[in-house]
Amino acid sequence: MWNSSDANFSCYHESVLGYRYFAVIWGVAVAVTGTVGNVLTLLALAIRPKLRTRFNLLIANLTLADLLYCTLLQPFSVDTYLHLHWRTGAVFCRIFGLLLFTSNSVSILTLCLIALGRYLLIAHPKLFPQVFSAKGIVLALVGSWVVGVTSFAPLWNVFVLVPVVCTCSFDRMRGRPYTTILMGIYFVLGLSSVGVFYCLIHRQVKRAARALDQYGLHQASIRSHQVAGTQEAMPGHFQELDSGVASRGPSEGISSEPVSAATTQTLEGDSSEAGGQGIRKAAQQIAERSLPEVHRKPRETAGARRATDAPSEFGKVTRMCFAVFLCFALSYIPFLLLNILDARGRAPRVVHMVAANLTWLNSCINPVLYAAMNRQFRHAYGSILKRGPQSFRRFH
């Protein structure tokens, strides 16, 4: 069943005559949604000042990889399913296969970079600007495409139409063992690395939450002693205290506005000193101080409330990052498992097609996540759709 169709480029099979129409409808929806959503994302990154961060260039890179697939490659996939025949020749079949796997590899590499950046921002904020400097970001962006192309270019002669999935891909038998190694590196090692980084992020968030919980208890104890007897003000003391917590709110700490994909991070205020470690230290320092002025209690309470809200900000980021990663992984896991468990191609052809078509989701889902979980992206999308060209003048 996995034999390539290099002679007539046909993927005709009686068992998929009905399913192909569903695949065509699904493919058109993915192409339209992905193209519109990813174009809106690029425009939002270009015109929204708070989204113009160095780190968000990774989001742009992920968006370009998705746009390559949705806009350029997906229409040919739809046409092939509609006619059950590849109609653009052998050379473009090879080009299609190379671009397809380049897009996938760039997406995985970018997701790894985003996860690494998010982890450094939380756990090692002083290291973040060194790794993700302007030069480092450019090298990472260019490197992801160079690595993607060069890793799959050696398969040029084995890119053919694979009838079981009705797509130009590499011939599984002729490409071994190189293809097995590549798939292991990108989809097993790559996705596992992303998962590990997000587990580490979750652990850092929990540590910060525990530290701020301790700070809250200490704060309550201090206020009780304050009400009992301390009435004398200490000039300038609250200003120092407020600058330690209140000013390190979401814009300077871990932003609740995600990236990318994903995603993950938008970094509305891209501060290199942000992170769970920084906020945790601030909470611990403030917990050691006293609050002597009763008449300034409302301001102090507001500052403390912003400090104790930090874990929820961390939680939003973690949930967003996990959602982007989860959507990407879930779109590929059925296809990967099916290829491992059904190496001899005994499963019905329609099962292979359904699993392959599910992978299309990862190229169009990220803009939906950005709109649903990111206020800045949501506002930028809305402004572009409502105002059109006027939105460009508005954000300059």
Curated annotation (Swiss-Prot):
InterPro entries linked to this entry: GPCR_Rhodpsn, GPCR_Rhodpsn_7TM
Distribution of this protein across tissues and organs: Expressed predominantly in hematopoietic tissues. Expressed mainly in the bone marrow with transcripts also detected in spleen, the lymph node, liver and the lung.
SUPFAM superfamilies: Family A G protein-coupled receptor-like
Membrane topology summary: Multi-pass membrane protein
Residues on Cytoplasmic side: 43-57, 116-135, 202-320, 374-396
Keyword Oxidoreductase set for record: no
Coiled coil start-end: none
Post-translational modification: Phosphorylated by a subset of GPR84-activating ligands. Constitutively phosphorylated at Ser-221 and Ser-224 in the absence of 2-HTP. By contrast, Thr-263 and Thr-264 are phosphorylated only following prior cell treatment with 2-HTP.
Localisation: Cell membrane
Glycosylation sites: N3, N8
Chief localisation class: membrane
GO molecular function: G protein-coupled receptor activity
TM regions (residue ranges): 22-42, 58-78, 95-115, 136-156, 181-201, 321-341, 353-373
Extracellular-facing ranges: 1-21, 79-94, 157-180, 342-352
Modified residues (Phosphothreonine): T263, T264
Biased composition regions of type Basic and acidic residues, renumbered to the chain: 290-308
Induction: By lipopolysaccharide and other pro-inflammatory molecules in the monocyte/macrophage cell lines. Also induced by high glucose concentrations and the presence of oxidized LDL.
Recorded phenotype for the gene knockout or disruption: GPR84 deficiency ameliorates LPS-induced acute lung injury with significantly lower mRNA levels of IL1b, IL6 and TNFalpha in the lung tissue. Also ameliorates dextran sulfate sodium (DSS)-induced colitis by reducing the number of proinflammatory intestinal macrophages.
Similarity remark: Belongs to the G-protein coupled receptor 1 family.
Known function: G protein-coupled receptor that responds endogenously to dietary fatty acids or nutrient, specifically medium-chain free fatty acid (FFA) with carbon chain lengths of C9 to C14. Capric acid (C10:0), undecanoic acid (C11:0) and lauric acid (C12:0) are the most potent agonists. In immune cells, functions as a pro-inflammatory receptor via 6-OAU and promotes the expression of pro-inflammatory mediators such as TNFalpha, IL-6 and IL-12B as well as stimulating chemotactic responses through activation of signaling mediators AKT, ERK and NF-kappa-B (by sim).
Subunit organization: Interacts with ARRB2 and ARR3.
Protein's recorded name: G-protein coupled receptor 84
Primary gene name: Gpr84
